[in-house]
Amino acid sequence: MSRIPLTSIEQQPEPVRQWMARRGNLKVFRLLANAPHVFPGWTQMVDELFESPTFSRRMREVVILRVAHLQGSRYELSQHVGIARNAGLTDQQINAILDTDHPDAAGFSDTERTALDVTSELCTTHRLRDDTFAAAQAVFGDEALTELLMIISCFYGLALVLNATDLDVDATARFQP
């Protein structure tokens, strides 16, 4: 049970209700809607991250699963493992992402391995070494690297909220990317 009560979907403004319905009417949205001055902007950012052509669904899910694992976010993992499969990740690759020490052992592309390295280092040390940053910048360029960092920060921050509030995993509802 969440440490903060979940809002009622019916009491939300129509645009928020529509967004929640489109994305799956999840408990996480009912939790975050407790911040009505911030939630609409957050939903817009999430939409932009999922609709941006910069990264494939597969790449986004590689990053999201790694963040969720490193942050111990049971909720994010429960929502995104299925999405990752639908985006083309194999169970072997998903298990490798969830392996703290060796996420690169399952046939990831060089670009995916670079994203995993950036995600792992940033989530565990809260910084990027110069060589890691330079390698990522060479692979992604400034625009895509910035977007990658924004994906990491979005799901890292969300994991903190979910872990702090101890939000229960939805029984059946799933996120609709």
Question: What residues fall within each predicted segment?
Answer:
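Hydrophobic alpha-helical segments
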Residues: 1-177
